[in-house]
Amino acid sequence: MEISDVLIHIDESVGHDSQFMLEEFLREVHGIVSPRFSMQQNHLMFVAYDSDATSAAMILEKIHGQGYEAQIVAI
């Protein structure tokens, strides 16, 4: 298992209930270890994932599939 992190910028502010629902959805995706929103900026999401099982691009695709416009932030 190789753990990697990705920072996702979601184009709109995400309310608390929507944050919870998106985090719960992503926790069910094979290879995602820990999705979490920034406490200070509710449009930024950090996702720890097993890069042997999934990729940042696949995570972004899953977020798009939930109806969010988002991009990977290079850090």
Segments and roles (model prediction):
Residues 8, 43-48:
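A generic structural motif
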Residues 14, 23-38:
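Short acidic amphipathic segments
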Residues 21-28, 58-66:
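Short amphipathic alpha-helices in soluble, non-transmembrane regions
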Residues 49-54:
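Helix N-cap motif at beta-to-alpha junctions
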Residues 1-12:
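Short glycine-/aliphatic-rich beta-strand segments at the starts of folded cytosolic domains
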Residues 35, 66-75:
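Conserved short beta-strand edge segments in small beta-sheet-based binding/regulatory domains
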Residues 3, 38-43:
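Short Gly/Ser/Thr- and Asp/Glu-enriched loop/turn motifs at secondary-structure junctions
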